[in-house]
């Protein structure tokens, strides 16, 4: 396997992991709470909730000196356990009885395991109405334009991310050193610093098993992609014209208005750029 291919795989893995913890899991936990807001507001809410929860979870377990993969995973599933308990509170005996009845049906061969775990298809079809189809069709132009912005980020920054294998800023080894010290429950090892960035890198390293230097090497591109999405989504919520946010983001993406250092910093995994996400 070539180094270019390996780097692309690593970028995809880190991107998927970061998306899971900052968008998908918050969506599962908070979608009913945020249902009353617009789509851009919901996305911003999920993203902020995911990042802030992970950062403060790492702070908590680090200060308690119990940080590790197990404690972080347990801390990550606590919100879902609380939500499930509140949802099922008072109905637990009924749920147990229903499960036992289904098990009895399985033993008698009346239903299969697929029906036991996923339910009947006709009930699911009833939930998906024509209005849902029309609602999703309405967002097709936004999805296409967002995909074009993502493709633009890959075009502008992707080649450098894939073909330059080392660190791209002189202070990245120091940040790597700080993150590695957190493996020993030693936070702020080289001084007090705005540590949310380090908490996120450490979480990706500890929970998903990535080497710290790998995350530091490829997260810069993932971070840059989310920076442009963090610019696009609020504009989509604020602008009356549907296409203005995409035009504005594209102009900033392809324009050359600032010094070269402004754009070169996007190639590195740096805390200042991580702060631009918020």
Protein language model regions, located:
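Membrane-embedded, hydrophobic transmembrane alpha-helices
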Residues: 1-136
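Hydrophobic alpha-helical transmembrane segments
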Residues: 13-28, 162-173, 216-224
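Transmembrane alpha-helix boundary and packing residues in multipass membrane permease domains
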Residues: 27, 58, 177, 202, ...
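Membrane-embedded helix bundles of polyisoprenyl
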Residues: 47-58, 146-154, 197, 219-238, ...
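Membrane-interface helix caps and helix-loop-helix hairpins in membrane proteins
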Residues: 62-66, 160-164, 260-270
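Transmembrane signal-anchor helices characteristic of membrane glycosylation enzymes that use polyprenol
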Residues: 85, 138-168
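Membrane-proximal lumenal/periplasmic loop motifs of glycosylation machinery
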Residues: 163-168, 183-198
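Short hydrophobic/aromatic helix or loop-helix immediately within or flanking a transmembrane segment
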Residues: 190-212
């Amino acid at each position: 396997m070539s180094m270019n291919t390996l780097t692309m795989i690593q970028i995809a893995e880190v991107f998927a992991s970061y998306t899971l913890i900052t968008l998908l899991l918050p969506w599962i936990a908070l979608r009913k709470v945020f249902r009353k807001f617009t789509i851009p507001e919901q996305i911003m809410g999920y993203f902020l909730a995911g990042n802030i929860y992970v950062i403060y979870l790492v702070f908590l377990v680090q200060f308690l000196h119990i940080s590790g993969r197990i404690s972080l995973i347990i801390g990550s599933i606590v919100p879902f356990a609380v939500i499930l308990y509140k949802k099922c509170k008072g109905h637990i005996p009924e749920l147990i009885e229903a499960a036992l009845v289904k098990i009895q049906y399985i033993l008698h061969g009346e239903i299969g395991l697929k029906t036991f775990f996923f339910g009947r298809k006709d009930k699911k079809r009833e939930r998906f109405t024509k209005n849902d189809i029309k609602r999703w069709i309405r967002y097709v132009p936004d999805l296409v334009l967002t995909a074009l912005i993502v493709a633009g980020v890959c075009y502008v920054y992707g080649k450098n991310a894939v073909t330059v294998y080392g660190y791209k800023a002189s202070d990245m080894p120091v940040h790597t050193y700080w993150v590695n010290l957190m493996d020993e429950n030693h936070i702020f090892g080289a001084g007090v610093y705005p540590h949310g960035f380090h908490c996120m890198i450490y979480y990706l390293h500890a929970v998903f098993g990535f080497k710290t230097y790998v995350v530091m090497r490829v997260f810069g591109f993932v971070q840059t992609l989310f920076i442009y999405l963090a610019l696009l989504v609020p504009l989509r919520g604020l602008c009356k014209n549907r296409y203005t946010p995409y035009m504005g983001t594209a102009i900033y993406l392809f324009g050359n208005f600032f010094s070269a250092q402004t754009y070169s910093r996007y190639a590195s995994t740096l805390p200042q750029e991580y702060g631009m996400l918020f």
